[in-house]
């Protein structure tokens, strides 16, 4: 199938609107991607004609809703090449998935004197849960430092592991720098030291194929809303043997086998024992539609288009005076920058006046901001629906801001 950005854009209603009297150039998909009509319609159709509470219902609507939900679990397992659909837990998003691992597996396996390794480029969602776990149990948090070019100082990694290392928690792709980490090398090293590996895939799964079996990671987590799906839904993958050993971290309906006031409670099997309460079934249906949509386009086709667009953007941005770019030349999805000494918020506000949506701030990565000694950065994201013309508008806008502000 030949990739056509014009055909893709036609599927996204919001891309036809104007902002401040100008066509919208949406360069903020790393924060949250827009939704195609196929996703919007699938979720709306479920609520119009198919909604019911899932699990245990004997009536037709409930049985059909349950089947649809479990079919999405199967589709998601194929999307990341898991061995079994029962290795996937529905979560609210990447943040909840990481917290689930920290509170279930972490509480059961990390003890005083143990250590967990993260990196200096992590999103707060892959820092704070581990800080909280370490504080609870008396463990140590170790950090892989950054290089100025936005890559990790991987030569330091072997020195961080020891017999007390329980986990390496690492981002697949940096949400600020676009750096893609060499996961196979890092995961192999971690396993040689007897440590498990959690991968934050929130910024990876929309850009190219992900194969959790080839990676051999123990945990992989991502969000639906960055993958052109709904908010409030994501996937946590856990190797089956690990998942079966993990205790539930939330209690309630749907995750129990039996409940007795005198004899206590027993749990249902994984993954359902990690899905307490009424699930976000509509969001799950929408996620399934998003997975179907990107799979039909072909992730390899998407990757080729986006990489060509990224190379074009980086070359064109060289013409902007006083522009500082952060991150390596080879990157995925995002371009972080500052313009002269102007605050990122000011630059972002000017761009918004030109109909260009970028993200400004610390991007939930304060340790990374501290490393570069800046309070904030602008970040332009490039997704499969962005165009060369939108890149040109960004470049022209930045040149104009430089002339105005000096």
From Swiss-Prot:
The keyword Calcium is annotated on this UniProt entry: no
Cofactor: pyridoxal 5'-phosphate
Gene Ontology CC annotation, any one: cytoplasm
E.C. code: 2.8.1.7, 4.4.1.16
Pathway(s) served: Cofactor biosynthesis; iron-sulfur cluster biosynthesis
Single GO MF annotation: pyridoxal phosphate binding
Active site: 364 (cysteine persulfide intermediate)
Keyword line: Cytoplasm, Lyase, Pyridoxal phosphate, Transferase
UniProt KW DNA-binding keyword: no
Catalytic reaction list: (sulfur carrier)-H + L-cysteine = (sulfur carrier)-SH + L-alanine; L-selenocysteine + AH2 = hydrogenselenide + L-alanine + A + H(+)
Cellular compartments annotated: Cytoplasm
GO biological-process terms attached to the record: cysteine metabolic process
Pfam families in the cross-refs: Aminotran_5
Protein function: Cysteine desulfurases mobilize the sulfur from L-cysteine to yield L-alanine, an essential step in sulfur metabolism for biosynthesis of a variety of sulfur-containing biomolecules. Component of the suf operon, which is activated and required under specific conditions such as oxidative stress and iron limitation. Acts as a potent selenocysteine lyase in vitro, that mobilizes selenium from L-selenocysteine. Selenocysteine lyase activity is however unsure in vivo.
Subunit structure: Homodimer. Interacts with SufE and the SufBCD complex composed of SufB, SufC and SufD. The interaction with SufE is required to mediate the direct transfer of the sulfur atom from the S-sulfanylcysteine.
Family membership: Belongs to the class-V pyridoxal-phosphate-dependent aminotransferase family. Csd subfamily.
Protein name per Swiss-Prot or TrEMBL: Cysteine desulfurase
UniProt gene name: sufS
């Amino acid at each position: 199938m030949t990739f056509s950005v014009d055909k893709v854009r036609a599927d996204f209603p919001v891309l036809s609107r104007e902002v401040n009297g100008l066509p919208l150039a949406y360069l903020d998909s790393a924060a949250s991607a827009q939704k195609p009509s196929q996703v919007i319609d699938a979720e709306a159709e479920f609520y119009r004609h198919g909604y019911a509470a899932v699990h245990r219902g004997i009536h037709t609507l409930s049985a059909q809703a349950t089947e649809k939900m479990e079919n999405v679990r199967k589709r998601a397992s194929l999307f990341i090449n898991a061995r079994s659909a029962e290795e996937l837990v529905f979560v609210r998003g990447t943040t909840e998935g990481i917290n689930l691992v920290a509170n279930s597996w972490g509480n059961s396996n990390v003890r005083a004197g143990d250590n967990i390794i993260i990196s200096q480029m992590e999103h707060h969602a892959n820092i704070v849960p581990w800080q909280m776990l370490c504080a609870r149990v008396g463990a140590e948090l170790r950090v892989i430092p950054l290089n100025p070019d936005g890559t990790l100082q991987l030569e330091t990694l072997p020195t961080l592991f020891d017999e007390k290392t329980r986990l390496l928690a690492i981002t697949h792709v940096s949400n600020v720098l676009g750096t893609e980490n060499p996961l196979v090398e890092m995961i192999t090293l971690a396993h040689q030291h007897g440590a498990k590996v959690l991968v934050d895939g929130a910024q990876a799964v929309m850009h190219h194929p992900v194969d959790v079996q080839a990676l051999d990671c123990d945990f992989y987590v991502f969000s639906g809303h960055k993958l052109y799906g709904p908010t409030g839904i994501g996937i946590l993958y856990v190797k089956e043997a690990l998942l079966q050993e993990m205790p539930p971290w939330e209690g309630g309906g749907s995750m129990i086998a039996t409940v007795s006031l005198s004899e206590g409670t027993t749990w249902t099997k994984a993954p359902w024992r990690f899905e307490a309460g009424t699930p976000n079934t509509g969001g799950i249906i929408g996620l399934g539609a998003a997975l179907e949509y990107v799979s039909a386009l072909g992730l390899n086709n998407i990757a080729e288009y986006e990489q060509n667009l990224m190379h074009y953007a980086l070359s064109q941005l060289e013409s902007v005076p006083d522009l500082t770019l952060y991150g390596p030349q080879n990157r995925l999805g995002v371009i972080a920058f500052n313009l002269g000494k102007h605050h990122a918020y000011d630059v972002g506000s000017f761009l918004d006046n030109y109909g260009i949506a970028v993200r400004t701030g610390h991007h939930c990565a304060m340790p990374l901001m501290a490393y570069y000694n800046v309070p904030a950065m602008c970040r332009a994201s490039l997704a499969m629906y962005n165009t060369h013309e939108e890149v040109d508008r960004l470049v022209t806008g930045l040149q104009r801001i430089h002339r105005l502000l000096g």
